[in-house]
Amino acid sequence: MTSRYAKRLQKELLDLKTNPPPCISITEGDNLDKWVIAVDGTEGSIYQGEHFKLQFKFSSGYPLDSPEVIFIGTPPIHPHIYSNGHICLSILYDNWSPALTVSSVCLSILSMLSGCTEKIRPTDDSKYVSRVLNKSPKEVRWMFHDDTV
């Protein structure tokens, strides 16, 4: 574990514990390599009253490399969230920036959920899930074509 990696994650973990964004709370963060974060559906959204869990896995290249972020347990039914928990969101892959933080990623995912008007899976859900099996979403080549949901 490099010192930059550890310092950055310790700072972000402390910030997330002491000043969490609305509807976001850390449930597991004792291990710097893997965190579990609870996400609650926002008031007025189609996910209001629902609770989800995100898993963040960090490599020693963080923050230069993006974390692996997936929903664990039962993922929300959403046009950009696959039934295996993989999330089609460009900032997790091609548009990652070291300026992004765990909190900002959580807020982006929460915003994506809050803006959704229909609970449906991606049209290629079955095909995608059977093709990727147990691969990390970071090993998948993503094509981003719909920013409206």
Swiss-Prot record:
Q: Name a biological process GO annotation.
A: proteasome-mediated ubiquitin-dependent protein catabolic process
Matching entries from InterPro entries are given as: Ub_conjugating_enzyme, UBQ-conjugat_E2_core, UBQ-conjugating_enzyme/RWD
Give this protein's Gene Ontology molecular function annotations. ATP binding; ubiquitin conjugating enzyme activity
Alphabetized PROSITE patterns for the sequence = UBC_2
Can you give the residue ranges of the UBC core domain? 4-149
**Which EC class, in a word?**
transferase
**SUPFAM superfamilies linked to this entry:** UBC-like
Question: What keyword terms does UniProt attach to this protein?
Answer: ATP-binding, Nucleotide-binding, Transferase, Ubl conjugation pathway
Q: Where is the active site?
A: 88 (glycyl thioester intermediate)
Q: What is its EC number?
A: 2.3.2.23, 2.3.2.25
Coiled-coil blocks: none
Superkingdom field? Eukaryota
GO CC annotations, alphabetized: nucleus
Q: Which reaction does it catalyse?
A: S-ubiquitinyl-[E1 ubiquitin-activating enzyme]-L-cysteine + [E2 ubiquitin-conjugating enzyme]-L-cysteine = [E1 ubiquitin-activating enzyme]-L-cysteine + S-ubiquitinyl-[E2 ubiquitin-conjugating enzyme]-L-cysteine; S-ubiquitinyl-[E1 ubiquitin-activating enzyme]-L-cysteine + [acceptor protein]-N-terminal-amino acid = [E1 ubiquitin-activating enzyme]-L-cysteine + N-terminal-ubiquitinyl-[acceptor protein]
**Which pathway does UniProt place it in?**
Protein modification; protein ubiquitination
On whether Ribonucleoprotein is a keyword of this UniProt record, the answer is no
Record bears the keyword Transcription regulation: no
- Chain's role: Catalyzes the covalent attachment of ubiquitin to other proteins.
* Family indicated by similarity: Belongs to the ubiquitin-conjugating enzyme family.
What this protein is called in its record is: Probable ubiquitin-conjugating enzyme E2 W
Gene assigned in the entry: ube2w
